[in-house]
A protein has these predicted regions:
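Polar-ligand-bearing catalytic/cofactor-coordination segments
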Residues: 1-185, 199, 203-280
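Alpha-helical transmembrane segments
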Residues: 193-197
């Protein structure tokens, strides 16, 4: 219970710091450049997004998990060989103590440049065979091979530009700020209007983001099978992950479209079987 409260407290702290930095930066830009604030805001928040990706694995994630280097055993050797084959430079291979709060099995590659590292959940190492772990690692390396992190940063930049442009248009409309009692976007009393705008924009963008994410995940699945040359292992992994992660095996199509960041487990298995059978 103490661990849960600790996690919640740290989450609140991170959220509060993020909110303060966002607000101070936004209003600083608006008051610094009252005519072209939207353009400067786009550039500033694009840079902050890239900075967050860089520092996330060394500043944020250690607040919630303990990380230990993967032992110098056969698995580490295979992981390093696979990364070399994939042409992906990894600064380190770490194990996260995810089991203290979840049964979810996962792995990910985080960071940029010197902060780039591969992280394996201890739940994954305990539940799966070595071949299954390698399949999951191959999937994560597939994301880096395809440059998905850079594509996501580029898409985020486009989304920020569209958002700031729309906000600049609204800011010029009479009456937009009246209900909040604000004189304009630079007025702190405009915050409720800005929060409402952010909420509505997020709802509009979410299905688009998730559709792109599902396409990226499907491509990473393809690369994982190419690297591991083991479609049967992929099927076993997807079945086990579906069970461990409590996945919905028959989600309604509208729900998948709006909320799913990954293809449903049955779709991923079907894609593997279709690929292995040579079907178009």
């Amino acid at each position: 219970m103490g661990s849960w409260f600790g996690d919640q407290g740290r989450s609140l702290l991170v959220g509060a710091v993020t909110a303060v930095v966002t607000a101070v930066t936004f209003y600083g830009v608006v008051r610094w450049q009252p005519r072209t604030w939207w353009l400067w805001g786009w550039a500033t928040f694009t840079a902050l997004t890239a900075l967050l990706v860089f520092i996330y694995p060394v500043v944020i994630t250690p607040l919630f998990n303990k990380f230990t280097p993967l032992g110098d055993d056969g698995l580490r050797t295979r992981v390093e060989q696979l990364a070399e084959t994939a042409g992906v430079d990894i600064a380190d291979v770490l194990v996260a103590d995810a089991s203290r709060r979840t049964t979810t099995e996962n792995a990910y590659v985080a960071g940029l440049g010197s902060t780039k590292r591969l992280v394996l959940y201890d739940t994954l190492l305990r539940s799966g065979s070595e071949d299954e772990t390698i399949l999951v690692v191959a999937h994560e390396l597939g994301h880096r091979m395809e440059g998905h992190i850079w594509k996501n940063l580029a898409l985020s930049s486009v989304g920020l530009l569209a958002g700031f442009g729309a906000l600049a248009f609204l800011a010029r409309q009479s009456g937009v700020w009246d209900w909040a009692g604000a004189s304009g976007i630079a007025d702190l009393r405009a915050i409720p209007v800005l929060l409402l705008f952010a909420l509505l924009a997020g709802l509009v963008v979410l299905p688009i983001e998730n559709t792109i994410s599902r396409n990226f995940e499907a491509r990473a699945d393809d690369i994982a099978i190419e690297l591991s040359d083991s479609p049967n292992t992929a099927v076993r992994v997807f079945r086990r992950l579906g069970y461990a992660n409590l996945a919905d095996l028959k989600p309604p199509a509208p729900l998948v479209w709006a909320l799913f960041t990954h293809p449903p487990i049955p779709d991923r298995i079907e894609a593997v079987l279709s690929r292995s059978s040579g079907a178009p």
